[in-house]
Amino acid sequence: MELKLDETLQKGIEAYGNGQVPEAERLFDQILISQPYHPDANHKMGVLAFGEGRMQEALAYFKIALEADSDMGEYWLNYIDALLELDKLDDAKAIFDQARLKGAKGEAFDLIGKRLSEPNVS
């Protein structure tokens, strides 16, 4: 079963990379039907929703992905970006602090940390 899920995830990633968003969404959703808390599938669905401007939906997917696997820095960064898109600066700062406490680090986190500390962040 896990191999089939991995294959489906890879096909979804390829479809997304080829601009086939509806097919990618269908494949990721197929994974979530059998494993609703699958971190990668939730994250990818969040990325799709974010790309289409559905920020509340993206937040929900990113949150589930983080709850399932809080070690993935990309999940934290995308969650923070979605919060900023919704002008939820205080929430974004709180999530950033949580990410740092979990050990998140690197250039991308340094950049978003600077962004969060600037006046008039958006």
Language model: regions and residue ranges:
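TPR/TPR-like alpha-solenoid repeats
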Residues: L48, A82, R115-N120
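Canonical tetratricopeptide repeat
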Residues: K44, N78, L111-R115
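Structural marker of alpha-solenoid helical repeat scaffolds
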Residues: S34, A68, L101-K102
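Short, charge-rich amphipathic alpha-helical segments embedded
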Residues: Q30-G51
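Structural signature of tandem alpha-helical TPR/SEL1-like repeats
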Residues: E2-D6, Y16-D29, G51-I64, L86-R100, ...
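TPR alpha-solenoid repeat register
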Residues: A41, Y75, A108-F109
